[in-house]
Structures are given as structure tokens and as C-alpha cells.
Amino acid sequence: MEFLPLFHNLRGSRVLVVGGGEIALRKSRLIADAGAVLRVVAPEIEAQLSELVVQSGGEMILRGYSESDLDGCVLIIAATDDEPLNAQVSHDARLRCVPVNVVDAPALCTVIFPAIVDRSPLVIAVSSGGDAPVLARLIRAKLETWIPSTYGQLAGLAARFRNQVKGLFPNVQQRRAFWEDVFQGAIADRQLAGQGAEAERLLIAKIAGEPPPETGEVYLVGAGPGDPDLLTFRALRLMQQADVVLYDRLVAPTILDLCRRDAERVYVGKRRAEHAVPQEQINQQLVALAKQGKRVVRLKGGDPFIFGRGGEEIEELAVHGIPFQVVPGITAASGCAAYAGIPLTHRDHAQSVRFITGHLKDGTTDLPWSDLVAPAQTLVFYMGLIGLPVICEELIRHGRSADTPAALVQQGTTVNQRVFTGTLANLPQLVAEHEVHAPTLVIIGEVVKLREKLAWFEGAQATV
């Protein structure tokens, strides 16, 4: 190990930065974030750096570097493009035994800056010893995606009760076991879900020796329209810690594969007019599994609150006092339209958009057709394939032009995506000609014309 990682408390201490340009600004921001007082020396100092110095309560010296500039400083940074000057700053700092960093010159440094993941008070540093800084930044980027921002709040919660726990458990091993249980259980789950008050209540109860609640938790997770890359970080994290996963027909296998490998998987998919599992039974199943102390992911295609019946499921959970979280997903309308190259709103074509269920009941749909034919709006029909002839006929009958552009997006956002464009008049015919099947989204409006020049994603087939 060439460099020993250490964390320095610079709050209120003076740090010298030699240089007044972009590189100096970048380093100074990091130093100022740590609460240091900046002393910047350079013949010219750019405006943003000047503002930063003032905010830190520091000083600007508008001249060339002098050895006396090191007086009273606990850290020195050379951030110029003048190599001889950088070498001189390094030499002077070493003589005084003051830590020095020279940007992009590891041989002149006694300290180096790592790539930092800041979840204060939790801070993670990644360093290559100056040999491969780009690699260190890439690793940091991966860590940023894996570690939720709420981990800082979790660390803060632990800090507030650290002394109390230390008094309760004088033995180091006992304290370690206590905190490991906290960070891997319901308390951490509540804090990471943004339920800080509940997390603190559970921690206080645990310190008091109260038995932990036996009830598990339900995570209502939106899986998005199909592309696994469109999952949120939180969705992925909860999927990987679930004991049981209840999933729908619209959840792609590639997304299901991202769940914890040993999790029990229960299919509760639905098709039109045929429910594999009745909704009431799904609700009861969620309650029963949570009461067994299990962490349950209810995985739904798209967004659980947009034609996903998620509201009904969490209502049942609330009645039984089951803790739950809701993780939004990218709904099919926005995901499929984006991948089809169809903006749902556009200044020249549509100032509003409506999401509508296209399910038929007794051969018709009970919709406000007069409102749906208003100009300058986009209509997006979910589950509208079976009822498409009725939808097109009613829109035309109520005044929408038969030449209105329209599109069918089948299996949008996936490698099997197919897009067919036409008009209200011939859209049902396109379904028959191209054997279009569910899941398919219907988009109606002038914005569909933009697909001709905005299409970017190549699926299995695209017909214009």
C-alpha cells in the first residue's frame, strides 16, 4: 500500500491553494465543503473561485507565489500549469513538513485526493494512488448507484444513539452485534425508506429491550415498461433483499432475474377477462406473507399507481397495519413513447396529454368522448388493443378527424419493440395486418408525425 487512507478534520483550518483557474476552483470546492478557510494565491483569480474564497471566510492574494504564503496553513495544494512553480511549492511544503498535493503530479505529492462518495457522515474514498484516477472515478460512479443517499441519515441516526448503546453494552462484541442487527433489519429499512421518525422509534424500543415487531414489510415496486435499465436504484435494491416476489404478466423475465436468487417467486399475472389470481386474493396474500415476517416485493409493470391497482393493495395493507413502501416506475406511456420517438407533448402540436384505460365493458367504453376530441392534446390508451375499433369509431364520431395520426407500440422499450403508425381510420386494420398483440400502447395525436424524424431506438421491427 503506497498511500495510507486518512480522513482529516479541516474545519476552521487554513488551506493554501496556489493557482486561480479551473483546476484550482475544482480543488477549492472540495476543501471548502470540508469547512476549511481558503487562502488562494495567483496573479489572476477567476470569479467563481473568488466567490468561494469569500464564502469560506478566506483571503485572496493577487500576485505570484511566495514561500511565506505557507505560513499558518495545514495543507498545501499546487494547482497551476506551471511545472517549475508546482515543484517549488512541493519542495517548500516538504521542508516545513506540511502535507502537499500537486495536481496531476503524484511524485510531487505527500497526499493525494481520492474519488469520494459523500453520504455524510458516511464518506467513502476510492484511490488508485494517482496511477489511474479515471478508474477510481468509474468505481466511485458504481458506488454512487449502489449506496442510497439516505445512508447518510442512517449513519446520523446511529451517531445520535452511539453513546447510549455504548453504555448499555460495555463489551465490544455485543455492541458490534447490536449495530449489525440494526443496519440489516427493520430499523435500517425504515430509515432508508425515508421514515426517519419510525426508524428512531424502533431503535429506542430496541435499546429498551422491547421485542422486535414480527411483521414484515411489503414493497410495491414499479418495474417500468420493460427495459431493465429503466429500473430505479431503489427498486433494484428492494428487489434484491426480498424474501418473496409477487409479479405480474407484464414484468419482463430480464427484470425478474434481477430479484434475489433465492427469493420465492409467485406469479399473480392477469389477462383481459381472465385473472390468474383475483385481486382480493392478491391483497390477502400480501397481508399473510408480511404477517409471517417476510419482506415482500409486489412487482408491477410500469408504475403501480397508474392503472396498476396499487392503491387497492396498499389500502388493504394499511387496514392491517402492515408497513409498506411504494417505489414509482416509469409508466408505459412515457417509456414507450420515448423509445418510439414520439414526444407526448410538443409546443407546436400538443399542450396536454391524457392517459386512458381502453378496457371494454359490455362491448363499449364509458369515456368522456367530447373531451377527448379537444385539439392540441395527445391521447394514450392503456389496454386498448381489444377495444381499438370502438375507440377509433367513437373519436371520429365525436369530431376527431379520421386522418389524425396514431401509433401502436408493441412491447415498447424492449428488443422486441414494434411500432406501427397510421391514422384513426386505419389503425384497427394495422392490428390485423401485422398481428399486433398485447402488451401494446395506443398513441393518438399530431405528435405521432414527429416519429418520422425522431425515431432512435431499433427494436425487432418498425413500420412507418
Swiss-Prot record:
Any one Pfam family match given in the protein's UniProt record, by short name: NAD_binding_7
Record PTM Phosphoserine, positions in chain: 128
Key words of the record: Cobalamin biosynthesis, Lyase, Methyltransferase, Multifunctional enzyme, NAD, Oxidoreductase, Phosphoprotein, Porphyrin biosynthesis, S-adenosyl-L-methionine, Transferase
Metabolic or biological pathway: Cofactor biosynthesis; adenosylcobalamin biosynthesis; precorrin-2 from uroporphyrinogen III: step 1/1; Cofactor biosynthesis; adenosylcobalamin biosynthesis; sirohydrochlorin from precorrin-2: step 1/1; Porphyrin-containing compound metabolism; siroheme biosynthesis; precorrin-2 from uroporphyrinogen III: step 1/1; Porphyrin-containing compound metabolism; siroheme biosynthesis; siroheme from sirohydrochlorin: step 1/1
GO MF terms held by the record: NAD binding; precorrin-2 dehydrogenase activity; sirohydrochlorin ferrochelatase activity; uroporphyrin-III C-methyltransferase activity
UniProt binding sites for S-adenosyl-L-methionine: 225, 301-303, 306, 331-332, 383, 412
Positions of region (Precorrin-2 dehydrogenase /sirohydrochlorin ferrochelatase): 1-203
Enzyme Commission code(s) on record: 2.1.1.107, 1.3.1.76, 4.99.1.4
Active-site feature positions: 248, 270
Reaction equations catalysed: uroporphyrinogen III + 2 S-adenosyl-L-methionine = precorrin-2 + 2 S-adenosyl-L-homocysteine + H(+); precorrin-2 + NAD(+) = sirohydrochlorin + NADH + 2 H(+); siroheme + 2 H(+) = sirohydrochlorin + Fe(2+)
Residues reported in the UniProt entry to bind NAD(+): 22-23, 43-44
Stretches the record annotates as Uroporphyrinogen-III C-methyltransferase: 216-464
Gene Ontology biological-process entries: cobalamin biosynthetic process; methylation; siroheme biosynthetic process
HAMAP family recorded: Siroheme_synth (MF_01646)
Recorded family membership: In the N-terminal section; belongs to the precorrin-2 dehydrogenase / sirohydrochlorin ferrochelatase family.
Function: Then it catalyzes the NAD-dependent ring dehydrogenation of precorrin-2 to yield sirohydrochlorin. Finally, it catalyzes the ferrochelation of sirohydrochlorin to yield siroheme.
Protein name listed in UniProt: Siroheme synthase
Name of the coding gene: cysG
